[in-house]
């Protein structure tokens, strides 16, 4: 039977011919070439059905419709009598997608890019999309300065009409900026202007933020910084006329020319406030206090706008609009600011919702909120809630947004989105020094037990000099008003001689508890009681120990080891101020604690101790990746009623939490072992640390972006350069002529300050916080022991 060709068409690969006959009635439709696509699915996409009278136009629409499905590379429609024969060539199915040579672009990002273009495993391959993807990726590389980059899509046929898709990258090298020229600057030198650029044609080794590799995005940011520089200095007519970026023939060098018009400096002639200010005109007027006669300042204007928005936001106006229109008088060189304000609607908060807290219970987050549901929205209260969630330390990131309630003109929902971090830690520490070798400790802590916000700790350690066990518990919301309750029980068998401290053994155990009372958002008080039993033995005849025992009415024999037991009850009082922006890796704010301890009647000892700790963070750039950290710790203790502070209550310094680069607890007075009762010249100085009843430690730290690390990890990794200093002294020390004659240092002198400098890396790992530091002593004294590299898990600051 002869087959008549009605139409052969392929929109992409073939041609079309018209069949001049009149239309005919379709009695059957037959497909050839279908493999993956079902007949029923193909029929559903055709505008022609059995029984229809079709024409050439209908056949053309059929071909268009089948191509539009994206399933076919070629479509041909034939007629055999009254039967339509549809011959198709299906597009191959993507069996796998791989990447090769991509270093600057991660696989996940590439997969997202392909997904957006509907290129994924199991889908039909549209070859026309591949060229668009190649061009798009190459354009990305050009935008980051890699003009030699090329991207090729390699398609490998497989059986059953399947293909492997491989994107092959040749990234090349980034073009380096050879020169940046600014043309038109008269009031400021090019060097002064270029110092504000991230892109530089000459990068000093010490400048970690500048970059000689061209990136279009960074150039855009630099141009904005240049514009802000002039606008902040009164140049209201400043303009960037043009920017030329020229490429060297080998595509490895870039020349940038920026043409500017500075204009003249303009002064503020006045401010005019207009619009709907929702009754807060007097308060807004105070915020718009830019002095007439002062130079026009773009940043100051932006700050004024934001301050007005924040003010209105505090009173429930969630979406105020504030726009400043400068009226420039070129003749008088003045600018009048017309500030147009529209407060908009006042909003209630319908609901406060949380997302991302898979472990932490909603109630734990909700109790940190200061914005109430069914109350007027307060933008300051919403931000305070975000700040309080950050301070908990349970979350890596906290974001908040207000969402309008559909169909309601005056209601919003507040949604806090959190990303939880591991709040449990395996506390384990290792230190290594040229003299100390390796030290080790282990424990466990969970700061968000079962998502309740309660803290539970179980710590146990055993090493050459100590066997220690502790169980602790804290409920930060023992009452709904935020009163906290906590306590611990502990046991410690400590052999000081094995720890290179003054020789004695102390078996102690005890229990303590406390209640914490919030005063306001940043201040809290803590009151507690504790009981400790100390059983001292194997005490060698050492000056500080014997002096303490004498004050307790004991008369130990110089020729034998002494023993002593004491049961003490103490009252603990503490104050904390905390306005840090977050619990882990703060970038701004201050945290200070003042703690006092005094024994109460019924105790064998009579003494008090006071410590003051403070940490202050000061960001030095807008995105808070560069931060200055200042830390200090002061401590003092003394006896009461003629008794001395027990030597085992002394302060110590040295190690990862005080003065890095020195052996733990090694800074300060050393043991003087007495060989003769009345002749100090026969006493023996040693290198064993005994601590002192007074201490001062200070540290200055520069926190920087971690080199070679993606910025998205900045909430879990932190690098810093530091200088530590500290001293420990003994105010009971008698620096007699006999002591000097025997070559014993003056341990009562607070000026024996140790100093070290180094670098630290902190990482909040799945195991818990890891801290690495390398430091070298700059100032040390005879008898000090160094420990350059220190490594701990379970401690951050």
From Swiss-Prot:
<keyword id="KW-0472">Membrane</keyword>
<feature type="domain" description="POTRA 3">
    <location>
        <begin position="175"/>
        <end position="263"/>
    </location>
</feature>
<feature type="signal peptide">
    <location>
        <begin position="1"/>
        <end position="20"/>
    </location>
</feature>
<dbReference type="InterPro" id="IPR039910">
    <property type="entry name" value="D15-like"/>
</dbReference>
<feature type="domain" description="POTRA 1">
    <location>
        <begin position="24"/>
        <end position="91"/>
    </location>
</feature>
<comment type="subunit">
    <text>Part of the Bam complex, which is composed of the outer membrane protein BamA, and four lipoproteins BamB, BamC, BamD and BamE.</text>
</comment>
<dbReference type="GO" id="GO:0043165">
    <property type="term" value="P:Gram-negative-bacterium-type cell outer membrane assembly"/>
</dbReference>
<dbReference type="GO" id="GO:1990063">
    <property type="term" value="C:Bam protein complex"/>
</dbReference>
<dbReference type="GO" id="GO:0051205">
    <property type="term" value="P:protein insertion into membrane"/>
</dbReference>
<keyword id="KW-0732">Signal</keyword>
<keyword id="KW-0812">Transmembrane</keyword>
<comment type="similarity">
    <text>Belongs to the BamA family.</text>
</comment>
<comment type="function">
    <text>Part of the outer membrane protein assembly complex, which is involved in assembly and insertion of beta-barrel proteins into the outer membrane. Constitutes, with BamD, the core component of the assembly machinery.</text>
</comment>
<dbReference type="InterPro" id="IPR010827">
    <property type="entry name" value="BamA/TamA_POTRA"/>
</dbReference>
<dbReference type="InterPro" id="IPR000184">
    <property type="entry name" value="Bac_surfAg_D15"/>
</dbReference>
<keyword id="KW-1134">Transmembrane beta strand</keyword>
<protein>
    <recommendedName>
        <fullName>Outer membrane protein assembly factor BamA</fullName>
    </recommendedName>
</protein>
<feature type="domain" description="POTRA 4">
    <location>
        <begin position="266"/>
        <end position="344"/>
    </location>
</feature>
<keyword id="KW-0677">Repeat</keyword>
<dbReference type="InterPro" id="IPR023707">
    <property type="entry name" value="OM_assembly_BamA"/>
</dbReference>
<feature type="domain" description="POTRA 5">
    <location>
        <begin position="347"/>
        <end position="421"/>
    </location>
</feature>
<dbReference type="Pfam" id="PF01103">
    <property type="entry name" value="Omp85"/>
</dbReference>
<dbReference type="Pfam" id="PF07244">
    <property type="entry name" value="POTRA"/>
</dbReference>
<keyword id="KW-0998">Cell outer membrane</keyword>
<dbReference type="InterPro" id="IPR034746">
    <property type="entry name" value="POTRA"/>
</dbReference>
<feature type="domain" description="POTRA 2">
    <location>
        <begin position="92"/>
        <end position="172"/>
    </location>
</feature>
């Amino acid at each position: 039977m002869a087959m008549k060709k009605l139409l052969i068409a392929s929109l992409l690969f073939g041609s079309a011919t018209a069949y001049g006959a009149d239309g005919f009635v379709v009695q059957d439709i037959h497909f050839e070439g279908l493999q993956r696509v079902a007949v029923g699915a193909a029929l559903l996409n055709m505008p022609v059905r059995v029984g229809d009278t079709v024409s050439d136009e209908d056949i053309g629409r059929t071909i268009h419709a089948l191509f539009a499905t994206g399933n076919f590379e070629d479509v041909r429609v034939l007629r055999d009598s009254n039967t339509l024969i549809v011959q198709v060539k299906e597009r191959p199915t993507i069996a796998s997608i791989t990447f090769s040579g991509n270093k600057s672009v991660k696989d996940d990002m590439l997969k997202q890019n392909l997904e957006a273009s509907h290129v994924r495993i199991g889908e039909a391959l549209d070859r026309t999309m591949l060229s668009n993807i190649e061009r798009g990726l190459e354009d990305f590389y050009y935008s980051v300065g890699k003009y030699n980059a090329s991207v090729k899509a390699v398609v490998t046929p497989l059986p059953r009409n399947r293909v492997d898709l491989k994107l092959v990258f040749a990234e090349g090298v980034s073009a380096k900026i050879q020169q940046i020229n600014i043309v038109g600057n008269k009031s400021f030198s090019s060097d002064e202007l270029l110092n504000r650029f991230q892109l530089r044609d000459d990068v000093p080794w010490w400048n970690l933020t500048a970059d000689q590799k061209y990136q279009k995005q960074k150039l855009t940011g630099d141009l904005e910084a240049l514009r802000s520089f002039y606008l902040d200095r009164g140049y209201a007519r400043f303009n960037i006329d043009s920017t030329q970026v020229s490429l060297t023939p080998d595509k490895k060098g870039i020349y940038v020319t920026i043409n500017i018009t500075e204009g003249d400096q303009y002064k503020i002639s006045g401010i005019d406030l207009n619009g709907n200010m929702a009754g807060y005109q007097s308060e807004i007027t105070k915020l718009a206090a830019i002095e007439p006669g002062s130079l026009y300042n773009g940043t100051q204007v932006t700050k004024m706008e934001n301050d007005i928005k924040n003010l209105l936001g505090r009173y429930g106006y969630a979406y105020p609009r504030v726009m400043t229109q400068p009226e420039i008088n070129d003749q008088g060189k003045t600018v009048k600011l017309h500030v147009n304000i529209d407060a908009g609607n006042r909003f209630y908060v319908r609901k406060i919702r949380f997302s991302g807290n898979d472990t932490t219970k909603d109630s734990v987050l909700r109790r940190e909120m200061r914005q109430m549901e069914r109350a007027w929205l307060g933008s300051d209260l919403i931000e305070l809630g975000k700040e309080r969630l950050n301070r908990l330390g349970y979350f890596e990131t906290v974001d908040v947004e207000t969402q309008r309630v559909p169909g309601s003109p005056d209601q919003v929902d507040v949604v806090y989105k959190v990303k939880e971090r591991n709040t449990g830690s395996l506390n384990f520490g290792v230190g290594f020094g040229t003299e100390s070798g390796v030290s080790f400790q282990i424990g466990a802590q969970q700061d968000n037990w079962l998502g309740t916000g309660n803290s539970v700790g179980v710590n146990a350690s055993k090493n050459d000099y100590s066997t220690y066990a502790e169980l602790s518990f804290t409920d930060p919301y023992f009452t709904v008003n935020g009163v906290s309750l906590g306590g611990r029980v502990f046991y410690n068998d400590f052999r000081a001689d094995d720890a290179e401290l003054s020789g004695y053994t102390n078996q102690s155990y005890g229990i303590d508890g406390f209640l914490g009372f919030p005063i306001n958002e940043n201040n809290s008080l803590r009151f507690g009681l504790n009981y400790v039993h100390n059983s001292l033995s194997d005490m060698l005849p050492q000056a500080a120990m014997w002096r303490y025992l004498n004050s307790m009415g004991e008369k130990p024999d110089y020729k034998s080891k002494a023993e002593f037991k004491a049961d003490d009850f103490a009252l603990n009082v503490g104050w904390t101020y905390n306005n840090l922006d977050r619990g882990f890796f703060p970038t701004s704010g201050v945290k200070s604690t003042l703690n006092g301890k005094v024994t109460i009647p019924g105790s064998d000892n009579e003494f008090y101790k006071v410590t003051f700790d403070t940490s202050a963070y000061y960001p030095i750039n807008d995105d808070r990746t560069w931060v200055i950290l200042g830390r200090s710790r002061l401590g003092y203790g003394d006896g009461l009623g003629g008794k001395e502070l027990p030597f085992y209550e002394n302060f110590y310094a040295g190690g990862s939490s005080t003065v890095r680069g020195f052996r733990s607890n090694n800074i300060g007075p050393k043991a003087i072992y007495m060989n003769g009762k009345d002749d100090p010249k026969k006493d023996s100085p040693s290198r064993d640390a005994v601590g002192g009843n007074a201490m001062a430690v200070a540290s200055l730290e520069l926190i920087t972006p971690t080199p070679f690390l993606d910025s998205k990890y900045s909430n879990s990794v932190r690098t810093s350069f530091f200088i530590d200093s500290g001293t420990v002294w003994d105010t009971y020390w008698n620096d007699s002529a006999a002591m000097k004659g025997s070559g014993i240092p003056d341990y009562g002198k607070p000026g024996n300050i140790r100093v070290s400098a180094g670098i630290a890396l902190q990482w909040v790992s799945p195991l818990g916080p890891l801290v690495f530091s390398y430091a070298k002593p700059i100032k040390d004294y005879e008898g000090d022991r160094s420990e350059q590299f220190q490594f701990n898990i379970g401690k951050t600051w």
